[in-house]
Amino acid sequence: MSKPLTIALSKGRILKETLPLLKAAGIELLEDPAASRKLIFDTTRDDVKIIIIRATDVPPYVQHGAADIGVAGKDVLMEHGGDGVFEPVDLDIARCKLMVAAMKDAPETGSRLRVATKFVNVAKAYYAQQGKQAEVIKLYGAMELAPLVGLADRIVDIVDTGNTLRANGLEPTELIAHISTRVIVNRASMKTRHSDIQTILDKLVEAVASRKAG
């Protein structure tokens, strides 16, 4: 018997919204991950295991073959670069926007911007495409604070409702990308386990369509 397929799921909001889709596709965890300290979970299918990890770890796990399939936000995939993986399915969940934001009524800066973000690669590529020089400062949280204390002119961050920005005197100024949750697949696994993986992908596509239909 071949080894089980491994699916890597992102912790947090994406996990909560992904589990019902997997259930509809015939894959259900045998125990509640919220009540367990486990990292590897058995499922209702003997040939499928699930690991639950940080969102930013999903792409490298799939890229290097530690997981055959992964589920992560498009923002994480953009930052990672997508090397070594296919991105065949948009689950259309955890939707938001990746945006540039600045202080309200902020004056135009000079030729060089200072930008705070955890999406360093995305920010550098975005400003390079615009022909603008930008010093990108990597932060890990509370991006809204950076313009308030003069650390940065702009931030690049995920925006859902925009309430946190407005509460701190900031406003979104430029849209970089619409974000949703995607399924990624290891390139080698897609060749060696094509039938098994494609069956799961097809069922997920059906589950997404059914969810949209209401």
UniProtKB/Swiss-Prot annotation:
It catalyses: 1-(5-phospho-beta-D-ribosyl)-ATP + diphosphate = 5-phospho-alpha-D-ribose 1-diphosphate + ATP. It comes from Alcanivorax borkumensis (strain ATCC 700651 / DSM 11573 / NCIMB 13689 / SK2). This is ATP phosphoribosyltransferase. Heteromultimer composed of HisG and HisZ subunits. Its main location: cytoplasm. One of its GO terms (cellular component) is cytoplasm. Lacks the C-terminal regulatory region which is replaced by HisZ. It is found in: Cytoplasm. It holds the Pfam family HisG. GO terms for biological process: L-histidine biosynthetic process. InterPro entries: ATP_PRibTrfase_cat, ATP_PRibTrfase_CS, ATP_PRibTrfase_HisG, ATP_PRibTrfase_HisG_short. NCBIfam families: hisG (TIGR00070). Pathway: Amino-acid biosynthesis; L-histidine biosynthesis; L-histidine from 5-phospho-alpha-D-ribose 1-diphosphate: step 1/9. Keywords: Amino-acid biosynthesis, ATP-binding, Cytoplasm, Glycosyltransferase, Histidine biosynthesis, Nucleotide-binding, Transferase. Catalyzes the condensation of ATP and 5-phosphoribose 1-diphosphate to form N'-(5'-phosphoribosyl)-ATP (PR-ATP). Has a crucial role in the pathway because the rate of histidine biosynthesis seems to be controlled primarily by regulation of HisG enzymatic activity. Gene3D superfamilies: Periplasmic binding protein-like II. Its EC number is 2.4.2.17. Belongs to the ATP phosphoribosyltransferase family. Short subfamily. GO terms for molecular function: ATP binding; ATP phosphoribosyltransferase activity.
